[in-house]
């Protein structure tokens, strides 16, 4: 399934990758989806958590690490179905139901995706989190108008490109041919595999989080960023049918084998928080042991920015 396509001024909220995500808003009354008009979208980055310390015995301040809690996206809007109060109530109910979806709200760690094709933007962008308060005012419902304010708590302070980027790295056996008698011991057999490296390109203005997928057969697979100390690997073997997904995104931070078994305790190398892909180019190298040449490592990411829209 794929997310619904948005036109100018439209938004959607729902499960990641779901074609049934709720679409609302538009750049005009004629194009407003769901009978909803959004008049304003405001972003509050939240209060920065600081680790500053006073200089002992003198004026001044020693700065520590500043962290951000995740932005709050506040939308002000209204249902707009003139002369149709019952329809207005239905439109608000549909939006509020999607905003406070219990399949997300009551599931530990689950997130929604808020997508925006902001008026004036050439692209659709997204943020991950949960719909929180949505507050209607019913005084003008008889006119088919229900003003509301809705808040969305993001997992971080980032808008991500809607289009997913990916890079596939493969392995190539380092030996070829066969053994032909007569043979004289000791036999010299290849014990390694040549692996591919290529470039991850993050065209956004911020670092972004990769999702790393290893597919067997391979033993001790590892993904490393060349000319850096950063790498992540698995201390085990994957069969040809095995798929290991390492999701470094802050709202996930999981390592799942075949979608059901957590193997986070079997990872080695750098912590997931160190795996961010920096803006511009990062050379990635896939390593491990595979004598078939069939294993792969797929790195997927979304370019990251601070703006709800833009040209790319």
Q: How does the language model describe each region?
A:
Residues 13-15, 115-123, 224-227, 288-290:
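Short acidic, glycine-rich loop/turn motifs
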Residues 67-69, 106-108, 142-146, 202-206, ...:
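Solvent-exposed loop and beta-edge segments used for protein-protein assembly and interaction
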Residues 57-89, 143-157, 282:
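Oligomerization/assembly interface segments of phage tail-like spikes and tubes
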Residues 108-161:
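Short beta-strand and beta-hairpin "edge-sheet" elements
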Residues 1-54:
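Polar/acidic, low-complexity leader/linker segments enriched in S/T/G and N/D
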Residues 162-312:
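Intrinsically disordered, low-complexity segments enriched in serine, threonine, and glycine
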Residues 69-127:
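Long, hydrophobic/aromatic-enriched structural stretches that serve as scaffold segments
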Residues 37-74, 132-138:
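Short, solvent-exposed beta-alpha or beta-beta edge segments that form flexible loop/patches at the rim
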């Amino acid at each position: 399934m794929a997310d619904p396509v948005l036109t100018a001024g439209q938004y959607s909220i729902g499960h990641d990758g779901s074609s049934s995500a709720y679409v609302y808003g538009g750049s005009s009354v004629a194009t407003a989806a769901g009978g909803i008009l959004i008049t304003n979208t405001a972003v509050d980055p939240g209060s920065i958590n600081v680790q500053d310390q006073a200089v002992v015995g003198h004026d001044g301040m020693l700065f520590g690490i500043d962290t951000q809690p995740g932005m709050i996206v506040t939308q002000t809007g209204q249902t707009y179905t003139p002369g149709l109060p019952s329809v207005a109530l239905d439109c608000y109910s549909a939006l509020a139901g999607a905003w406070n979806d219990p399949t997300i709200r009551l599931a530990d760690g689950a997130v929604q995706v808020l997508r925006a094709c902001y008026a004036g933007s050439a692209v659709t962008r997204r943020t991950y989190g949960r719909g929180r308060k949505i507050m209607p005012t019913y005084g003008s419902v008889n006119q088919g108008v229900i003003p509301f304010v809705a808040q969305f708590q993001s997992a971080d302070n980032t808008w991500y490109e809607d289009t997913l980027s990916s890079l596939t790295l493969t392995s190539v056996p380092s030996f070829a041919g066969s053994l032909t008698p007569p043979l004289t011991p000791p036999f010299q057999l290849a014990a390694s595999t040549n692996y591919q490296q290529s470039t991850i390109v993050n065209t956004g203005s911020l670092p972004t989080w990769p999702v790393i997928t290893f597919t067997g057969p391979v033993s001790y697979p590892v993904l490393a960023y060349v000319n850096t100390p950063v790498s992540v690997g698995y201390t085990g073997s994957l069969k040809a049918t095995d798929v290991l997904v390492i999701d470094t995104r802050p709202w996930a931070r999981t390592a799942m084998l075949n979608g059901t078994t957590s193997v986070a305790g079997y990872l080695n190398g750098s912590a997931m928080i160190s795996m961010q892909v920096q803006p511009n180019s990062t050379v990635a190298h896939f390593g491990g042991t595979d004598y078939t040449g069939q294993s792969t490592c797929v790195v997927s990411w979304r370019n990251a920015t601070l703006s709800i829209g833009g040209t790319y």
